[in-house]
Amino acid sequence: MKKERLMSINKEKAEAAIYQFLEAIGENPNREGLLDTPKRVAKMYAEMFLGLGKDPKEEFTAVFKEQHEDVVIVKGISFYSICEHHLVPFYGKAHIAYLPSDGRVTGLSKLARAVEVASKRPQLQERLTSQIADALVEALNPKGTLVMVEAEHMCMTMRGIKKPGSKTITTTARGLYKESRAERQEVISLMTKD
């Protein structure tokens, strides 16, 4: 699948655009250190945008009926994405909780795969958080879902305000975790506990 996506990128067009960008900033794209840069950057972005055209809910291919009705939490799922405003990285951790309905659970790796698909595209952290939650709701129809994403944005570290180390936290709650503040707080405390 990865190879398919890499092949679907218009490499020639991407390489030409990067070549022109280097010229636009006053660089010589024909100098030794930059000769292969357009090709390398196009290949890198093809990999970083593997999630384009994919739906994160399609990652939930394994759904099992178990006698489990209590919360399931997977925390600390590392990810990186590209800010769609500045095309620089943001990266961090996603924490996912869901309360199974009728014992429907999924493979734990499927949660990480959904994060991967949703993050590998030009993205906003707020949208990323919602897309992960919505994919889980559509795939499993749980009683409740809560997604928390903590990330550092290079657009705040490298430019503008220049505040390295600052983290942005976003949450999205669905079902019981949206309706009940007490239930939501309990799950958040489990997510943030070391």
Curated annotation (Swiss-Prot):
Question: What quaternary arrangement does the UniProt entry report?
Answer: Homomer.
Asked whether the UniProt record includes Transit peptide among its keywords, one would answer no
* Keyword line: GTP-binding, Hydrolase, Metal-binding, Nucleotide-binding, One-carbon metabolism, Zinc
**Does the entry feature the keyword Zinc, yes or no?**
yes
Q: Which reaction does it catalyse?
A: GTP + H2O = 7,8-dihydroneopterin 3'-triphosphate + formate + H(+)
According to its UniProt entry, one GO biological process term is:
tetrahydrofolate biosynthetic process
Give the family from UniProt. Belongs to the GTP cyclohydrolase I family.
EC number(s) from the headed UniProt entry = 3.5.4.16
* Sample GO molecular function, one term: GTP binding
Q: What is this protein called?
A: GTP cyclohydrolase 1
Lineage start: Bacteria, Bacillati, Bacillota, Bacilli, Lactobacillales
